[in-house]
A protein has these predicted regions:
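Conserved donor NDP-sugar-binding/catalytic core segment of glycosyltransferases
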Residues: 103-136
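A structural helix-start
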Residues: 17-25, 45, 49, 53, ...
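Conserved donor nucleotide-binding strand/loop of the catalytic core
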Residues: 53-87, 99
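Short aromatic/hydrophobic "clamp" motif used to bind/position activated sugar donors
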Residues: 91
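Short alpha-helix within the catalytic core of nucleotide-sugar-dependent glycosyltransferases
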Residues: 25-29, 53-54, 88, 101-113
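A conserved acidic beta->alpha catalytic loop
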Residues: 30, 45-54, 71, 95
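Conserved nucleotide-sugar donor-binding catalytic segment
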Residues: 13, 75-76, 84, 123, ...
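N-proximal low-complexity "stem/linker" segments adjacent to membrane-targeting elements
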Residues: 1-32
Length: 162
C-alpha cells in the first residue's frame, strides 16, 4: 500500500547486468525518459567482462548507483543483494534487454493513489525481435485481478511489477 503522505514516492529500479551491453543503452534511456522522475537505479554489475560499465557511465545521472560483484552470483541472489541497496518505497525490475514505455512508472504510481488497498500493480509487455517485429504476450482478456502476486511470480512476469 502506498504511503498516504508521500505525494512523490521514490521508486527503486533494479537492473541486474551480466554482459548486457547489447541493449543496455536503450534500456537505461527508457528509464531516464520516464515522465515520472523520482526514481533511483540500482545497477548491479554481476561480474561483467564486456563494456557494460562503460555504457552505463555514459549516463551522468545522480540517480544511478553502480555496484560491482567480484564473483558471478545467480540472478535470484543478485536481485536480493541489490534489493538491500534500495531506498525507495517501491521496487521494480528493469533488465538490460528491456525497454519501458515513457509513462510506465507514472501510470503505475497513479494507480496506487487511486486505490489505497493495492499492494502490487503490473503491466502488459511485448517481446521485440530484432527491434522490428513484436509479439504481445499478455492480452487484456486474461489479465488476472484480485490476489495476483503469486500468479505473476509463477509466470515470470517480474519485469512489469511495481
Amino acid at each position: 500500500m502506498v504511503n498516504e503522505t508521500a505525494k512523490n514516492p521514490l521508486v527503486s529500479v533494479i537492473m541486474n547486468c551480466h554482459n548486457g551491453e547489447t541493449y543496455l543503452k536503450e534500456s537505461i534511456s527508457s528509464l531516464i525518459n520516464q515522465t515520472y522522475k523520482n526514481w533511483e537505479l540500482i545497477f548491479w554489475d554481476n561480474f561483467s567482462s564486456d563494456s557494460s560499465k562503460e555504457v552505463l557511465m555514459q549516463f551522468s545521472d545522480k540517480r544511478i548507483k553502480y555496484y560491482y560483484t567480484k564473483n558471478f552470483t545467480p540472478l535470484y541472489e543478485a536481485r536480493n543483494l541489490a534489493i538491500k541497496k534500495t531506498s525507495g518505497e517501491f521496487i521494480s525490475f528493469l533488465d538490460t534487454d528491456d525497454w519501458w514505455s515513457p509513462k510506465r512508472l507514472e501510470k503505475q504510481i497513479e494507480l496506487f493513489f487511486k486505490d489505497k488497498n493495492l499492494d502490487v500493480v503490473y503491466t502488459n509487455f511485448y517481446f521485440f525481435y530484432n527491434k522490428t517485429k513484436t509479439k504481445k504476450i499478455i492480452s487484456k482478456k486474461n489479465l488476472p485481478d484480485g490476489k495476483i502476486t503469486q500468479k505473476l511470480l509463477d509466470h515470470y512476469n517480474i519485469g512489469g511489477i511495481l
